[in-house]
């Protein structure tokens, strides 16, 4: 009987560490998103490729191709015309890091969630909340792309309402 109690404590502690790690990652994503916004980097990646977008440009030809796509955006024409490739790499880094961190958060959340669920390590009360977190994460990524797309058409900036929704969903996810 004592062993079972010890196992329950261990399970509870492991789940708590996982949830706290998720909260810290959400906070870091908000900080990274703020840096991305303040550096004007959010429109530097003009495509939304969930899997292949995980790999940054690896050679000069790929960098030049990404830069040429950016040069077609309103932000480049109205604000950053004449930007060098090295300046582009700086803003690209922040948007790339923002997206990469989001993908990492997804992996850090979904695999342990499925493992804990399969092993019966999550309380019945916690499972619906965590499913809401999964749904919010997917919606947030979708709204993030809508936000970026809003700045690639006519304006050199993103729609403020979309930005607010994107940030609010991130904060809301931390409170579920």
State where each predicted segment sits:
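C-terminal ends of transmembrane alpha-helices
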Residues: 31-37, 138-155
């Amino acid at each position: 009987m004592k062993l079972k109690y010890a196992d329950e404590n261990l399970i509870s502690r492991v789940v708590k560490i996982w949830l706290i790690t998720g909260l810290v990652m959400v906070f870091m994503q908000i900080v990274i998103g703020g840096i991305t916004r303040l550096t004007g980097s959010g429109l530097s990646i003009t495509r939304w490729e969930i899997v292949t977008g995980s790999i940054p440009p690896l050679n000069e030809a790929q960098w030049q191709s990404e830069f040429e796509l950016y040069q077609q955006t309103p932000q480049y024409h109205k604000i950053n015309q004449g930007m060098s490739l090295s300046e582009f790499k700086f803003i690209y880094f922040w948007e790339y890091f923002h997206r990469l961190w989001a993908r990492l958060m997804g992996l850090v959340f979904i695999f342990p969630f499925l493992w804990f669920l399969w092993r019966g390590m999550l309380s019945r009360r916690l499972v619906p909340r965590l499913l809401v977190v999964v749904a919010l994460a997917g919606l947030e990524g979708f709204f993030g792309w809508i936000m970026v797309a809003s700045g690639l058409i006519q304006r050199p900036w993103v729609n403020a309402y979309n930005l607010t929704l994107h940030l609010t969903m991130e904060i809301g996810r931390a409170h579920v």
